[in-house]
Regions:
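Helix-adjacent hinge/juxtasegments
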Residues: 57-85
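Interfacial loop-to-transmembrane junctions
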Residues: 112-134
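N-terminal membrane topogenic signal
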Residues: 1-14, 126
Length: 153
């Protein structure tokens, strides 16, 4: 099994909590649904913080490495912002920021010189995984704003 297959397998395993935390609220509803969405935001905040640190491992000879390091810190701080918004019950804002952060991290990673040398399977995997994570946050956002499922607006 080559390294791209291993990364792909682990990446999709890492997606399972996103799917679980976004779909289960539609099934069970009520207070547990709110808790599951909060868990999704917590998990997403951890992941985006972790992803932000990737830029520190990229080659220092890249043209924009100073920018990459700064952007990586901003993505990590956005994870803290998501947690803070969740703590203060600004769930919908945290969900929207999560979508934006994961999408922009993909754009950020795609623009790096490191990404250009990755094989096509990895590039396709990252695109699909980012899309799935963003969709999971959209599903949770729909649950949150649905007046029939959420009394917390």
């Amino acid at each position: 099994m080559n390294i791209t297959n291993i990364k792909t397998t682990y990446g999709y395993i890492g997606f399972i909590p996103f799917a679980f935390f976004s779909l289960l609220p539609w099934i069970i509803g009520g207070e547990p649904a709110k808790t599951l969405i909060i868990f999704q935001l917590g998990y997403g905040a951890i992941i985006i913080t972790f992803l932000g640190g990737f830029s520190w491992g990229w080659s220092d000879e890249q043209i924009n490495q100073k920018f990459n390091l700064s952007a990586g810190i901003l993505f990590s701080l956005s994870g803290c912002l998501i947690l803070l918004l969740t703590y203060f019950s600004k769930i919908l804002i945290a969900l929207i920021i999560s979508i934006i952060c994961f999408y922009f991290f993909y754009i950020f990673e795609k623009s790096s010189e490191v990404f250009k040398f990755k094989d096509d399977d990895y590039k396709k995997f990252r695109k699909i995984l980012t899309l799935l994570v963003c969709i999971s946050f959209l599903i949770s956002s729909w649950y949150w704003i649905n007046p029939y499922s959420n009394p917390y607006l």
